Amino acid sequence: MSEEKKQKLTGINFRDVSTCESTIQMLQKVADDGFETAFTRAADMKPCPIGADSACCKHCFMGPCRLNPKDPYTKTGVCGATIDTVAARNFARMVASGGAAHTDHGMSMLDMFREVVKGNIKGYKITDEVKLRNVATSIGIAVADRTTEEIAMDLYNELERTYTQVEGEIPFAKRVPPKTLETWRKAGIVPRGAMREIMELMHRSHMGVDQDYENIVKQCSRTALADGWGGSMVATEISDIIFGTPTPKVAGVNMGFLKEDHVNIIVHGHEPLLF
């Protein structure tokens, strides 16, 4: 390891990035051993000052266009976008990408749920029938005198609209507190369907489509709600129904829980289908 690289890796005070003593010790050991982490790479990265203020646009091939955050309204991008529009477009693309990630995760969980209900997947089962009935009831599905399989299939068909519906309101909008839902309706941000909202946000943030930053940000709100009250909520509820609703447990945590004389298996992530 060169002296320059060693200085970059070991010249960081890891107490500035964590309050956890064991994490600080491990970060220091990794650096001393000559390996990079996100923290050392971040310290070595000098952010672009224009990009840091979201004043750079590269959504089309007439650019990239750089605007001056210190003198923001003296010029526009080639397409005529102001700095407000550029910032809104940049933020919109991040909202769309994050929403798509949660939406796809939720769809995977829902696809698995359908196959479990149909009996095509034998390794999983409906573990929490009470949660199944509560979720079904919350969105208007009848549960009295019906089998678990009947309720589950109706729940699948209803929740599928979270993703595929192109008009109306997503199913879990029925769970939103009435005053909050009224506010959303007045603002025009109740999600129709996750795919529709993400697609429209990508469309609006494209060059030559929507130059009004307020319109773009409004669609950001609708897409974010499609994520939180759609894709993410579906994933959470289906996970609980299949794997069981979490309950408080006493567990060991942190680096100090690893045992030197054991084979330690570390599970990372939130995709329960893999486990």
Describe the function of each predicted region:
Residues 2-275:
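Metallocofactor- and cofactor-centric catalytic cores in central/energy metabolism, strongly enriched
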